[in-house]
Amino acid sequence: MKADMPLANGLQALPSNDPHMAMRRVRRLHFVGIGGAGMGGIAEVLHNMGYTISGSDQAANGMTRRLQDLGVRVACGHAAAHIEGADAVVTSSAISATNPEVAAAHAQRVPVVPRAEMLAELMRFRYGVAVAGTHGKTTTTSLIASLLAEGGLDPTFVIGGRLNSTASHAKLGQSRYLVAEADESDASFLFLQPMLAVVTNIDADHLPTYGGDLGRLRATFREFLHHLPFYGLVVACLDDPGVAELLPSIKRPVLTYGLQETADVRASNLRYSGTRAQFQVTMPDRAPVQVDLNLPGAHNVRNALAAIAVAAELEVPSPAIQRGLQQFAGIERRFRAQDITIAAGRITWVDDYGHHPTEIAATVQAARDAWPGRRLVVAFQPHRYTRTRDLFEDFTQVLTAIDLLVLLEVYAAGEAVITGATGRDLARAMRMRGVEPIFVPALADCPGLLRHVLRAQDVLLTLGAGSIGSLARTLPTTLSPEAGSC
């Protein structure tokens, strides 16, 4: 770690912008699985605070390359030698206890710190804004960070997606504000103790973490919200049934948002124009504000309302809120739309991370609102066999509302195959409903098939949280008129 001055006990002082005097014994932090969005973002912030950061991952990706460009030492593969000299080892829930670096840390009595606990340490001496919810966390966190920055508050942020305006997942700001996602997938958000918490929605997902019990999931959200101090603030989406059901039991101040007339922060006069949404916002103690949001869909209007509520609470002026929403540059793989030319003519291609039935339905509706009357072609890769099993009927229902579906095999994300929960099983269930999807077992075959089925003026959606995201780098080329048939 960079030192401002030596200490009498031989330790070094922390950098002047680091309030964590209790961490003065920590100079070097090693991240196992540093290529993950959440891990890499925290590593980048700590690197910029002056800590010596190293890390490892199974394979290089955009995150590892960015960190290497910043001067972080990143190893490909895992080996016990990588932790030599580390004062603590940071891991994500995806890393097994049998990982050689984790095992070596335990053997050497080096603290092994969960990712969320390290995020909690970053938040401990700051004004923490934590965004929780099954859907919309990344977009809402990005919007909040953008509005605070537009208002001159210069926040630190850690986001699960790459913010296009900064080309990064994270930034070390100079103010006391820290904005971050709160991850319910492994219940690790219980490490956090923010000053302000947003809850976008509570839906059935990651149920294996909660023993398959939706009630237990909701109870864990309640526990998270009670980690706020009694003078903190919960910003909650009144439109979501899961959140609305929880509100009577929340013993903290609450500010609601949504499209309902009873919401504290409410959108009205909503209309769509291409990939933008226009609406008026009414909120306590401010004049109504007219908003031109550079995002499509009612779900993004709600995400924007959450960000507006937080920005208003932190006294960002209304003109800055309007500018921030109008100029918002979006996030990688969140409704990223572009027109491309294929052999049949021009089409619109939207790439999106959505992989839950609720997210798919919202993205499909946003596309229909943006380009009414055009044929909608969706290439969807289900993510995890457990999710496909738990939400099988919901997937079947939402996917039947698409004009033409290209269905890929499930992206396992390390899970074993579950009988009855494969992509082929989904395709079979849809055929029983009278819908004929095109099943493609291998992702590599998808571009070639799309060349044959796409027509001029189609809207193509590529959806999923797995390897389908790699199409974003190659699809315009593989679908171009100059490309050969696959």
Show where each model-derived region lies.
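C-terminal helical cap/extension that packs against the catalytic core
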Residues: 266, 396-456
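N-terminal leader/targeting and accessory segments in enzymes
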Residues: 1-118, 233, 241, 266, ...
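Phosphate-binding loop of NTP-binding sites
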Residues: 45-48, 68, 82, 93-238, ...
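Conserved hydrophobic helix-helix packing surfaces used for dimerization/oligomerization
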Residues: 28-31, 89, 129, 155, ...
